[in-house]
């Protein structure tokens, strides 16, 4: 009622409005002050809602805070958390463990990366892996390459068969993007695909150094496995896909989103592409 009275007071005497409502002047001003205090974050709340829905509920208060900073709203994370609570906004994402597709394992290359997933520039260190995705009764296999510099998906292939054609397609897509990859390290687990002569030959032709995790040690390829966990939590487990084709279409959009819009704390609140661009342009 305080808001309504405040809106009507330009046309009617305040005393009359308070008398009709049987409200004391002190009570009116108390509620009016409280309303104005609450409303001082009205613009911020609109931006929070926009960010939250733009990212389909995938962002918790920490990422919302970082994105708010990117948009010029310099509120701390506690305030953002409180405002999100007031708006009833809560991230629907809960990270889950996953199991990647390994096949037979064996080692033909040393573990050069040795859990050092940092890189000083793009295209110094890449990681790859294969994960299985089940849509109804159909199994799909996703094989991406990630840049350790910024976590960007360089290329990927999704197929119904985890065969070498999938791996070759993924490599070819990556190789055509760059003039030279001399000295790049490409890290993987000990999956059979990465032991294959054809895989090793293609790396050799492009002067790429092969690195392999230790047997049965998922932490040695944590960067690729972390991406799979994020993708499955934010995409696969949040929607019911009617067909493998529907999932593949959604995956294409998700990877575009992941590279260009999804911000990361380790990238100083930037998306992978934004971070790479800034590293080049300064």
Each predicted region: which residue ranges?
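Residue-centric detector for conserved, function-critical "anchor" positions
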Residues: 1-12, 16, 22, 38-39, ...
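K/E-rich alpha-helical interaction surfaces of small helical-bundle regulatory domains
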Residues: 16-35, 54-56, 245-269
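Mobile genetic element proteins and their domesticated derivatives, centered on retroelements
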Residues: 17-21, 28, 48, 64, ...
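RNase H-like two-metal-ion nuclease catalytic core shared by retroviral integrases
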Residues: 102-104, 188-190, 196-198, 212-232, ...
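An active-site-proximal beta-strand-loop segment
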Residues: 119-154, 160-162
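C-terminal domain-tail junction helix/linker
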Residues: 204-208, 230-282
């Amino acid at each position: 009622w305080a808001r309504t009275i405040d809106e009507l007071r330009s046309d009617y005497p305040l005393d009359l409005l308070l008398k009709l409502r049987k409200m004391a002047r002190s009570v009116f001003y108390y509620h009016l002050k409280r309303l104005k205090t609450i409303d001082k974050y009205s613009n911020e709340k609109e931006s929070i809602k926009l960010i939250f829905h733009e990212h389909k509920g995938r962002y918790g208060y920490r990422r919302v805070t970082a994105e708010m900073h990117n948009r010029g709203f310099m509120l701390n994370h506690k305030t953002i958390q409180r405002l999100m609570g007031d708006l009833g906004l809560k991230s629907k994402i809960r990270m889950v463990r996953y199991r990647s597709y390994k096949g037979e394992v064996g080692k033909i290359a040393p573990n050069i990366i040795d859990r050092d997933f940092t890189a000083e520039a793009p295209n110094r260190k890449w990681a790859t892996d294969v994960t299985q995705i089940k849509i109804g009764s159909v199994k799909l296999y996703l094989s991406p390459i990630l840049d350790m510099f910024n976590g960007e998906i360089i290329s990927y292939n999704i197929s119904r068969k985890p065969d070498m054609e999938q791996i070759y397609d993924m490599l070819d897509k990556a190789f055509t993007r760059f003039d030279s990859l001399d000295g790049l390290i490409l890290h993987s687990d000990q999956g059979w695909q990465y032991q294959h002569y054809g895989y090793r030959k293609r790396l050799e032709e492009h002067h790429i150094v092969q690195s392999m995790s230790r047997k049965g040690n998922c932490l040695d390829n944590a960067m690729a496995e972390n991406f799979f966990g994020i993708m499955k939590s934010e995409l696969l487990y949040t929607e019911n896909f009617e067909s493998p084709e529907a999932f593949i279409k959604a995956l294409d959009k998700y990877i575009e989103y992941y590279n260009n819009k999804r911000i990361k704390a380790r990238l100083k609140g930037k998306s992978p592409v934004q971070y790479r661009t800034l590293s080049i342009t300064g």
